[in-house]
């Protein structure tokens, strides 16, 4: 999966480790959300699977960044000049605090070494999107997106059609 734009120098790609095709990429910035053993029919062992992710981290361009979930046991092997950050829901270099969930809405304060942003509202109020949002906001900040643009983007993001859609939202349902 990828997102291309005629007016942006950035491309967003959901990389796939299935057949090691992510080894063909040379990202400037990357997020690794999980390394749960998968595709062992291809990799053979959990160790080989993790080694494939370690190799992927060597492909990040100097001057870029790796944002890796803090619970991942992977030891990245980045090139000189690549910054490595951690993230998670409530811990890490990038994380959420003051999480408020209720009435079909989620708000939180985004904590970042690049500058905090208060009162983030999720457009798709599903708890896992707190963590996903933290990683997305980290990439956005590193790309020069303003705090106001980040807040608006998080609030208006609607996700994939037909996933977690509200059909009715009132006090009775």
Q: How would you describe each model-predicted region?
A:
Residues 33, 49, 67, 96, ...:
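Residue-level signal for inorganic ion chemistry
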Residues 60-61, 158:
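A generic alpha-to-beta junction signature in SAM-dependent methyltransferases
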Residues 103-106, 124-135, 158-164:
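Short glycine/threonine-rich catalytic loop with a Thr-x-Gly-x-Asp
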Residues 38-47:
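Flexible beta-alpha connector loops of hexameric P-loop NTPases
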Residues 52-60:
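Substrate-engagement module of ASCE P-loop NTPases
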Residues 2-38, 76-119, 160-170:
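Extended acidic/charged loop-beta regions that coordinate divalent cations
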Residues 86-87, 140-173:
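Gly/charged, well-structured mid-domain segments that form the phosphate/adenylate-handling core
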Residues 64:
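Glycine-centered, small-residue-biased loops immediately flanking beta-strands
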């Amino acid at each position: 999966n990828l997102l291309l734009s005629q007016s942006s120098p950035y491309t967003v790609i959901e990389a796939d480790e299935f057949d090691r095709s992510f080894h063909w990429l040379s990202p400037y910035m990357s997020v690794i959300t999980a390394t749960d053993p998968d595709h062992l029919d291809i990799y053979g062992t959990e160790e080989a699977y993790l080694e494939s992710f370690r190799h992927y981290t060597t492909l990040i361009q100097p001057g870029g960044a790796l944002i890796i979930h803090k619970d991942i046991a992977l030891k990245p092997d980045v090139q000189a000049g690549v910054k490595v950050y951690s993230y998670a829901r409530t811990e890490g270099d990038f994380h959420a605090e003051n999480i408020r969930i209720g009435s079909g809405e989620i708000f939180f304060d985004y904590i970042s070494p690049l500058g905090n942003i208060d009162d983030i509202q999720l457009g798709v109020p599903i708890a896992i999107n707190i963590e996903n949002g933290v990683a997305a906001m980290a990439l956005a900040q590193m790309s020069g997106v303003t705090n106001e643009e980040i807040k608006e983007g998080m609030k208006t993001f609607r996700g994939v059609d037909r996933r977690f859609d509200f059909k009715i939202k009132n006090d009775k349902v």
